[in-house]
């Protein structure tokens, strides 16, 4: 397991403790004085990156327009992404200090703080930025497995683990790709118009002129990532490239020639990507458990450890699988174009009810709004990111929004056990 030294940048305008002391009174994540935060595990999606396509001509076939040019290699965290994650880290550090978990003693020793990222550049760089923001001046080092980009970390792999034929058939029967295709007809039509697909090399040279024409298939293979092929996969790739350019602030001429000219259009085309993620494990909790049980087991290990603060940095595919495996109910994220936002964070929170001593659990999705992403808004307790409470169908909430921690541990254990079947 490699350790990456903490990187401090000129972007840090003060420590987490200073921010926590002088911030205005704002407690977006504190249930009441009767509860105290015992520990938290933060699972973060990596921050704002460049598109993952390595061939610069890969996107050219979809549109006659010029695509955005990037100053970092494919799939790398951008400079803006580093700033955004540093700001997010500063907010987290202030919140953790405010809740009494990030103390001066814990900062100095580093004991009880664990930070671990998948071994690719965008996750490691994201982790470094969060650590720099949250734990400025602390004895905290980000860890990862193997050499950067050279080895796959099994914890973060979202591949099927020897799925039975019965599981594969059941999962495929639970997904109606034809109905999904019909549902997205207007979205494909708008995207096709925006990128001028009728004048693309795909249409003019190959005769493939219907962007939404291929229903595709639900692909489940041992040792391979679960995926949906066809038009929704192509649409997701195109929308992702446009959205990343939008977030990073590329000129309009490099974003479909300026044709995505309203928030309504952004929401409409991004629904293709959102539906891909909603559908990937929809009604397929068992498959999600099969895919994600190594990560679920690692999360349980960290929650059961002496660590008070754990940070894991992975990918959107990890979050999609985790939410499905744990039976999280459908949700909506206000002020976000994405349902799995870039840089978004799942907070697995263990709280103690002080009068009774009982442990309670909350799962929150904390994320930067679209406006905060684009404007590079500094975050603090006074200007926090958005937060949405998630609901696990197997863990009933009380009137305060908590479920019993013991019951959550049962849900987690059952998910891991089912995944190993």
Labelled PLM ranges:
Residues 24-114, 118-310, 316-421:
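Signature for phosphate-centric chemistry
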Residues 16-18, 126:
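Short linear Ser/Thr-Pro motifs
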Residues 1-8:
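Bacterial N-terminal signal peptides that target proteins for export
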Residues 9-16:
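Bacterial N-terminal signal peptides
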Residues 19-23:
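Sec/Tat signal peptide C-region and signal peptidase I cleavage site
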């Amino acid at each position: 397991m490699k350790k990456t030294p903490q990187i401090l940048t000129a972007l840090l305008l003060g420590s987490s403790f200073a921010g926590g002391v002088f911030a205005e009174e704002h407690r977006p994540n504190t249930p009441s004085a009767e509860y105290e935060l015992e520990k938290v595990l933060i699972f973060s999606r990596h921050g704002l990156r460049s598109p993952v396509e390595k061939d610069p001509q890969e996107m050219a076939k979809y549109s006659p327009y010029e695509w955005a040019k990037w100053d970092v290699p494919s799939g790398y965290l951008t400079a803006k992404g580093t700033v955004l994650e540093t700001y997010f880290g500063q907010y987290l550090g202030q919140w953790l200090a405010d809740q009494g978990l990030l103390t001066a003693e814990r900062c100095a020793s580093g004991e009880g703080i664990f930070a671990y990222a998948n071994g690719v550049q965008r996750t490691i760089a994201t982790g470094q930025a969060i650590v720099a923001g949250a734990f400025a001046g602390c004895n905290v080092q980000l860890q990862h497995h193997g050499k950067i980009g050279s080895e796959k970390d099994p914890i973060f792999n979202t591949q099927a683990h020897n799925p039975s034929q019965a599981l594969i058939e059941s999962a495929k029967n639970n997904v109606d790709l034809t109905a999904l295709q019909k549902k997205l007809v207007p979205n494909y039509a708008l995207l096709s118009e925006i990128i001028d697909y009728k004048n693309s090399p795909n249409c003019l040279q190959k005769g493939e002129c219907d962007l939404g024409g291929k229903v595709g298939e639900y692909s489940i293979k041992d040792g391979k990532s679960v995926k949906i092929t066809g038009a929704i996969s192509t649409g997701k790739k195109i929308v992702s490239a446009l959205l990343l350019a939008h977030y990073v602030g590329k000129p309009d001429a490099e974003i479909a020639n300026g044709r995505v000219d309203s928030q309504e259009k952004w929401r409409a085309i991004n629904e293709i990507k959102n539906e891909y993620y909603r559908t990937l494990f929809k009604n397929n909790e068992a498959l999600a458990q099969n895919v994600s049980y190594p990560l679920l087991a690692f999360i349980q290990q960290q929650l059961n450890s002496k660590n008070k603060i754990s940070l894991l940095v992975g990918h959107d595919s990890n979050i999609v699988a985790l939410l499905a495996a744990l039976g999280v109910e459908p949700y909506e994220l206000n002020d976000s174009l994405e349902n799995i936002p870039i840089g978004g964070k799942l907070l697995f929170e263990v709280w103690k009810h002080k009068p009774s001593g009982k442990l309670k659990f909350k799962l929150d999705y904390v994320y930067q709004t679209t406006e905060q992403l684009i404007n590079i808004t500094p975050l603090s307790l006074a200007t926090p990111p958005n937060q949405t409470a998630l609901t696990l169908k197997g863990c009933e909430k009380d009137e305060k929004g908590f479920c019993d921690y013991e019951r959550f541990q049962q849900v987690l254990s059952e998910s891991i056990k089912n995944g190993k079947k």
